[in-house]
Amino acid sequence: MDWAINVAHPRLLYKDPKLSVTFIVPSLFHIIIAFVLLGICASDFLCPNVAHISDPNSLRSNGSLVSKTASHASHTGALMAVLLSWCNSSPDLFSNLMSWATSTRETRSTSVSLSIGEVLGACGIILCIVEGSIFIIMSRTHIEISQIQKLSIMRDLLFSLAAMCVMSYVSLMNQVTVLNCLLMAFLYAFYLVVKLTFKLNHSAETPDETAADTSLRENSVSPFLDDSLMASGLLPPIQPGFDISNSITHGIKPSLLSAMDFNSFLSMLENSSLEEDDSRNEMAELNTLRSMTPGQHWSASATVAGEATSAGRPFSEPTNAFTEYRDSERAINSSPAVFAPYRDNPDDEESQEQVLLETTTHGHFGAQEMRRFSKRSLGWIIKIFIPHLSNFSQKSISDAIFSIITVPFFIIFKLSCPQPPSDILSYDPTLNRYSLTTLPIILLFIQSITAPFLLCSILSVLLTYHLGYLVYLFPLILAMALILLLTAFITKVNLHNKFTLSLDSSNILQEKLQKRKLLERLNTSIQIIFLAIGIINIIIWISLLANSLIEMMEIYQKILGLSKAILGLTIFAWGNSVGDLISNISMCRLYKTQTHYQDRVRLATKFFMISCASCLGGVMLNSMGGIGFSGLVSMLFIGAFNDNEWWFLRKVKLQETSQLDNTLNYKFIVSCVFIILQIILLLLFFGGPNNIKRRLTKEMKLVGISMCGLWALATLINILLELFS
């Protein structure tokens, strides 16, 4: 356990760090792996589990007694969208929370400065770099923004402007107070209420938009789109038939035909016969069904049959060749080897022959069965624990290296984060039977044991404290309870499927119906319990990885003599924003799957607005939600922020160790000013005067380059301020 604690906490691993090759190379590798694992935790485990547990339809079995109504799905869709947006930004949120929660009374000012710098850096990258990249990509396509889309994006821009004004006030006051955090949390909550209400009132789509979405689902996206980025865990893959507008119902990562299956299917189609079935081929197939004869007569009969067929005779006409055989030339029909001749002494040679026969037969079939079982087991292991290696031969060198490196981490995540599928239980109305999928059930039994014990182990590593043996009684009891629950579930399914000869009276049918309802409720309860355990475990994993990154940044800050503010504005912000950049760019490229011009324009507009709205939502979540929630929890419940004052008077200064007292941190102010300028530019593009909008729309590529250059200039100014301060 000590080695795991040292690896997870760089301050313990690098006790005397210096700028040397022996420190820089492993530390940079440490940072890259931590960022990649954060993306894997969020996209592969946390997001799918939250999407599954928040959708009642996905918790029901196939053939459930409760119908999956569309109205219920639309009612929960908005809540699911909010939860999934929170999950996609979970690395930023948890790194923000950990920088506050792990502070001491001496380091709280620098830790909060790192948090504010990371948030402002992430907001600037998302609004300037990501939005600018979107504008550059969409500059080649004509877009038509509707009035509802314009009002929606204008509302989000105004909320983002208000959020940046609050951040500017905090930077000018050079402190964060409890009242500031309350205001931020209230502003984000009000944003959610307005957004959900507005979405519900204007969620109806035109028939043209619906037709375009249907056409998009029919025209599948290539399964190899951005495969190199998906393998690193930074990008949730864009799958075939991935409908963005309805992605919540299908989960974050809809299943797709793997590369191996796709290539096998393609080769099967290429190798199939493209010729028309002529008479000779059909006659040859008919002849193979007849009794075998010696080779010379068989070839003669096939020739005669072919000539008769070519003359226009029907295929069913018997050929003369079969009447030419003499008895001596008939095919020999021998009995099987087990039908041995009669012997007076059965213990004589019969036993020896039988043993030889059984040994040969059993040896052949046993080896074949073992090969088949090993191949099937290998397929199960790849499918369950290392699915990102299924198309390993088609990965680039860098992706293959990262895929191999992350294999042990992915296996540990899989063992600690149960993900029961929605189709674990299905009902066949014709047979009145339930069927269980074997592989997920086996995996749930394994995770029933591993997940509780890994939970205690992760907590021990995160707290850098060896838990007592009595603490491990809790995971032991929990594991036994989960195993008993699964066993009872399987037993009830088998009892329901048991054949009975009872009469189907009304009372018996009603009793069967009640048992079905209880069985389906048990299925739903099992899914919720395992999903909740998975969410708790993966949140602790994300907290551990985020804390490791923060400790690594603190080491570099001490070695280089840099402030935590500039580290948060640059390295930390870029590391947590790469995933947003890649996913939004890939989303914009989806319009290329449509060939019809009008559908192409409509889909391009739709994905453009989705990308812009997701960027603004990320800004609101990181700034108001992240700082507001983290600051409020820390200043109310963590002793390092308690200066024996009333709770509403508590505050923390944004003070670096190299700064004088009450000196403003101009890097924060510069960042806020440039972000506000970017928001004003977006307001002019979407809601400015018509002549300005037309000019900006024509020069979208130039506008996108200007947006990227805006944040590049802000970063340059911040670096100069850091160097000369």
Curated annotation (Swiss-Prot):
It comes from the Eukaryota. It is a multi-pass membrane protein. One of its GO terms (biological process) is intracellular calcium ion homeostasis. One of its GO terms (molecular function) is monoatomic cation transmembrane transporter activity. GO terms for cellular component: endoplasmic reticulum; membrane. It is found in: Membrane. The chain crosses the membrane at residues 21-41, 119-139, 157-177, 178-198, 397-417, 439-459, 470-490, 526-546, 559-579, 621-641, 668-688, 704-724. InterPro entries: CaCA_antiporter, NaCa_Exmemb, NCX_ion-bd_dom_sf. Keywords: Membrane, Transmembrane, Transmembrane helix, Transport. Belongs to the Ca(2+):cation antiporter (CaCA) (TC 2.A.19) family. This is Protein ECM27. It comes from Saccharomyces cerevisiae (strain ATCC 204508 / S288c) (Baker's yeast). The lineage of its organism: Eukaryota, Fungi, Dikarya, Ascomycota, Saccharomycotina. The gene is ECM27.
